[in-house]
Amino acid sequence: MARSRFDTGSGPSQRQLRVGELIRRTLSSVLNQGDIHDPDLNRMSITVGEVRTSPDLKVATAYVLPLGGHGAQDALDALRRNRHELRRAVSKELTLKFSPELRFQIDETFDRMDETRRLLSQDHVRQDLDKPDED
């Protein structure tokens, strides 16, 4: 298969990013409206932070976190239990050749940002950052 001259080979393609964002919006909408027939899932307020798709768009991994960050494992279990119904809801909204298999992961972005802030606020790191450039 020939590669596009615009493809650098690193990172997701524009199509992957676009489809991932469409799936993210659709999942968020379905979860907010409570269209899923699971009372446990409908009681939770879940944030869909990002959706990454495989290059062939057949697998979509949604990074989710319940509001407040509490009960993350319960939310993940409920989403995994209802993944087939969520997949049907996504495929009803989007016009894709294949309905992607949905996988769910806990979104750790906020934890990583907090850790980065903590590291950057340490005294020995701060003094290195505050040094004037010698160029």
Curated annotation (Swiss-Prot):
Pfam families, alphabetized: RBFA
PANTHER family: RIBOSOME-BINDING FACTOR A, CHLOROPLASTIC-RELATED (PTHR33515:SF1)
PROSITE patterns per record: RBFA
Protein family membership: Belongs to the RbfA family.
Cytoplasm as UniProt keyword: yes
Keyword Cytoplasm on entry: yes
GO MF annotation, one: ribosomal small subunit binding
Disulfide bonds: none
Gene3D superfamilies reported in the protein's UniProt record: 3.30.300.20
NCBIfam families found in the cross-reference section: PRK00521.2-5
GO biological process: maturation of SSU-rRNA
A single GO cellular-component term on record: cytosol
Keywords for this protein: Cytoplasm, Ribosome biogenesis
Subunit structure: Monomer. Binds 30S ribosomal subunits, but not 50S ribosomal subunits or 70S ribosomes.
Organism: Dinoroseobacter shibae (strain DSM 16493 / NCIMB 14021 / DFL 12)
Protein name (database record): Ribosome-binding factor A
Function summary: One of several proteins that assist in the late maturation steps of the functional core of the 30S ribosomal subunit. Associates with free 30S ribosomal subunits (but not with 30S subunits that are part of 70S ribosomes or polysomes). Required for efficient processing of 16S rRNA. May interact with the 5'-terminal helix region of 16S rRNA.
Compartment annotation: Cytoplasm
Superkingdom of origin: Bacteria
